[in-house]
Amino acid sequence: MIRKKLDIKKGFIFVLLLVLFDQLIKFYIKLNFPLTLYNQPAIIDLGFFKLLFIENKGMAMGARLNNLLPFLDDYTAKLSLTLFRIIAVFGIGYWLISTLKKNKSNLLKITLCLIFAGALGNIIDSVFYGQLFSSSYGQVAAFWPEAGYAPLFFGNVVDMLQFLTITWTWPE
């Protein structure tokens, strides 16, 4: 059996389709649902998987750069984080292209495509969403409002998927 290798052209198409799919889902969720607040039901709840609408102003799990570096103000921290994301995407992109050119496993290539597409989607969110949408807090966002909820480079990243791998009960 001959296995076809993922080359640059197929990798580019795969990443493009992933980013397009990611953005279409985010647009649909933002324009049809308010933010999922703590203790509110999920949009979709299959037990092991939940679809939530959460916006993240910082990094993973809501951490902000100025939580780690308290001498930074909110403005500088958010701008630095967005610029870091852009620089990181170039690094990930270089790694992806060099891997696609080599005779590496398709699993590695697909994994890097997924990471790159996710990082690119986060950049689109943080750079443009503040201008493209109104606030989603307590309401459904509007597309292309007169004034967005944040300036260019200061939008929130949309996080939606939650896979439950560990469950526990918080002590009261």
What residue ranges belong to the model's regions?
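Alpha-helical transmembrane bundles and membrane-interface segments of multipass inner-membrane proteins
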Residues: M1-E172
